[in-house]
Amino acid sequence: MQVTETLNEGLKREIKVVVPAGDLEAKLAERLETARGRARINGFRPGKVPTAHLRKMYGKSFMAEIVNEILNDLSRSILAERNEKSATQPEVIMSEDEKEAEKVLDGKADFVFSLNYEVLPAIEVKDFSKIAVTREVVDISDEEVDEQVKRIASSTRTFETKKGKAENEDRVTIDYLGKLDGEPFEGGADNDAQLVLGSGQFIPGFEEQLIGLKAGDEKVITVTFPAEYGAAHLAGKEATFDIKVKEVAKPNELVLDDETAKKLGIESLERLRQVVREQIESQYGQVTRQKVKRQILDALDGDYQFETPQKLVDAEFNNIWQQINFDLQQAGRTFEDEETTEEAAREEYRKLAERRVRLGLVLSEIGEKAGVEVTEEELQRAVYDQVRRYPDQEKEIYDFLRRTPDAVANLRAPIFEEKVVDHLLANINVTDKKVSKEELTAEDEDAASEAKPAKKAAAKKKAAPKKKAEEGKSEEA
């Protein structure tokens, strides 16, 4: 067998392999001899089937198996002998000449093929102990906890029908029909919708115009959808809503006690406060970690500059680009609406893909050198979390994960990355800084999540006047 390197440029490699016909023939002879003892063919005693007859019956199928085994085994062994790691599965290039392929299967021609691949770059882990990051910390006040407890407990609040005019904090039950230029628009109507005035549930200007109405009243109100509204065909547009008030109800006093907590499934008010505080701490902690992680990645980005495997970059870019176009389509927007062009966006996200790949390789090398591993328990927990996202499809998801090693690898990767970040945090300079919750959560274009750094168009929502339809703000790296 001849193995010849025919390309060595940067990370690109091409290896030409020639397996002599004689070697193939020898492997085939071994396989035919093994088959002779097992074959049961009419007219022949066991173990007495002539080799020529076996070759006629099984020769090509056996040779095809031999060729596939050679491809699988040599791809691994060649990389191991060269002490190289392929960034992706090596591409096998063979002759497309059918006559040539027939000769190989008949044992009359050498088996010639090439392996094309990109090697993972050699990365020397640098001293990261001098990396310095600021960890923003928020002190959670009792007032904030109580405010959140009250907000949660308000779902247990009861209302009592009243005859007077609707006031702030009253609950109104209404039918509404939204119109643009006098024509009803999709998703702009609802019956028996319940709205607590002053809750901010609907878009600005809607709730205020219902104050003072009584049950049985009808009114046409005019509102303007926010410019950043999720449904692009409504964003910034003036619309009218035909309103019919069916009931006005006043809120009963909200009592915060153990009974209220029990209605929420918590044993006591004190335990409810504790749960709420833990939730707030977790929410702020996630934001803090993302900001710290971004600082670490930015520092590593400045320390490591090297050529990245283009196939990995291509795959990452395609994932990003597919998501970007899906988001734009869902929102009914274009690149021009985002104040850019497709060409400029491609360039931006190509750079982003290259950064992601490079940092991924750096984190992988740091983790490997540090002995970071993902335990089976951690992986099983990730599998369980994944399955929980698809209720009533548990069996299908489990079967898919069993059949698809890459899917399991995709679950393992983020766990590994977070453990590497933990390792870095334990070995770099971290300075805590007390900030307000407003400072912590303030939008920062350069501090968006590295896991999802692509700027996303707002998702299309039901075209109702509900304020929550505005959600889906953009993110960018």
UniProtKB/Swiss-Prot annotation:
Residues 467-477 have a biased composition (Basic and acidic residues). Disulfide bonds: none annotated. Keywords: Cell cycle, Cell division, Chaperone, Cytoplasm, Isomerase, Rotamase. It catalyses: [protein]-peptidylproline (omega=180) = [protein]-peptidylproline (omega=0). Pfam families: FKBP_C (PF00254), Trigger_C (PF05698), Trigger_N (PF05697). Belongs to the FKBP-type PPIase family. Tig subfamily. This is Trigger factor. The lineage of its organism: Bacteria, Pseudomonadati, Pseudomonadota, Alphaproteobacteria, Hyphomicrobiales.
